[in-house]
Amino acid sequence: MSRQQHQVCGDPNRFQVVADFVITQFGKRVRYIADVAGGKGVLTRMLNKKNLDCELIDPRQKSVKGIKHRREPFLPEMTDYYDLLIGLHPDGALRELGEAALTRPVVMIPCCNFWDQHRRGQKELLAAIKNFYQDNDVRYQEIVLNFKG
């Protein structure tokens, strides 16, 4: 009898791809990581298994067992403790995560446009984020990760 897997929507490989990216880009230079609006905490668990101290920040009550979980909405003021913030499809926390990049390194993989009230398409979303970073002198790099959705 095999153990029950957590059901996820979207490309199930995205968690592994992002975890590998974090290891490759940051390695041991980061110690404390926040998985912002990370749903059930699948990415949090993967990063913990790679010996990184990752904590889920998400107001939803359900999460995988054995992870640290702050059950509250993410606010940019929470960043002092963390070396790196990750938002894999952070939805409603997208804008707050973007603002947190003013003070901390952020890996942000947006999906839906929760940046502003107009909810425009993907190109407009990325342009709005880039403009915000440029206006605030935030260094950023746009990359494409190898997963769908």
Walk through the language-model features, giving the residues of each.
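Hydrophobic anchor at the start of a short beta-strand
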Residues: 53-57, 106, 138-140
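A short SAM/SAH-binding and catalytic strip from SAM-dependent methyltransferases
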Residues: 83-97, 101, 112
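Conserved beta-strand signature within the Rossmann-like core of class I S-adenosyl-L-methionine
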Residues: 104-118
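Active-site capping/gating segments
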Residues: 120-149
